[in-house]
């Protein structure tokens, strides 16, 4: 990838405040905001078409087949999906017509980022309590679970998957000495934003 672009990477786990922080950086500093989640379905289908095994499997699954499985298996699968689409994510970043980009997504796992050797990378993960309480407020949650026979069990499995994912990301960040913020809701969004700006040395 072209290295004359400045790219601020915010990885971590869902429902941690990543997108809110990225949006504020974009507005305050004029950075182009690249949200990986906007391309997840597209990239998963492309990877499936290229024969990537996990993506190929997932695109054919029903809601029950996705959400009613062991959360540990779901977490393993999520990490593998991000690995299978990583080339597509970075290709899209390369095509983005801006020399200053802020990008966020759970797809930026510590292992993937080590492969690409980018320095300006942090992660934000939520505490389990913060994650679940905020997911319950999301308007699109029922849409994701549409088609599940037992929506409560599916939601519980989803939450457990993301709790496990956050734990794995935090452990990898600690192992690799990558800055990682745990958002437990005790700090305001302004305080979280200030911390991230300091990590990226944004004045």
What does each model-identified segment do?
Residues 1-5:
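Phosphate-binding P-loop
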Residues 19:
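Walker A/P-loop
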Residues 31-47:
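Short beta-strand-centered segment that lines the nucleotide-binding/catalytic pocket of NTP-utilizing
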Residues 164-203:
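NTP-dependent small-molecule kinase module
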Residues 42-100:
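ATP-dependent small-molecule kinase phosphotransfer cores
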Residues 10:
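Hydrophobic anchor at the beta1->P-loop junction of P-loop NTPases
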Residues 120-165:
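A glycine- and Lys/Arg-enriched "phosphate-lid" helix/loop adjacent to the NTP-binding pocket
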Residues 15-16:
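ATP-binding Walker
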């Amino acid at each position: 990838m072209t290295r004359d672009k400045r790219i601020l990477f915010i990885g971590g786990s869902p429902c941690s405040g990543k997108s809110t922080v990225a949006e504020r950086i974009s507005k305050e500093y004029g950075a182009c905001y690249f949200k990986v989640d906007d391309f997840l379905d597209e990239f998963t289908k492309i990877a499936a078409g290229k024969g990537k095994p996990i993506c190929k499997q997932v695109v054919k699954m029903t809601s029950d087949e996705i959400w009613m499985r062991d959360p540990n298996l779901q977490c393993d699968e999520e990490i593998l999906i991000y690995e299978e689409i990583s080339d597509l994510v970075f290709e899209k970043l390369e095509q983005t017509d801006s020399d200053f980009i802020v990008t966020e997504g759970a797809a930026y796992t510590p292992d993937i980022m080590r492969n690409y050797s980018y320095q300006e990378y942090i992660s934000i993960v939520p505490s389990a309590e913060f994650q679940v309480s905020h997911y319950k407020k999301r308007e699109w949650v029922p849409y994701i679970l549409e088609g599940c026979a037992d929506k409560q069990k599916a939601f519980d499995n989803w939450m457990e998957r993301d709790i496990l994912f956050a734990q794995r990301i935090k452990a990898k960040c600690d192992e690799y000495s990558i800055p990682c913020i745990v958002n437990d809701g005790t700090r305001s969004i302004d305080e979280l934003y200030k911390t991230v700006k300091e990590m990226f040395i944004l004045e």
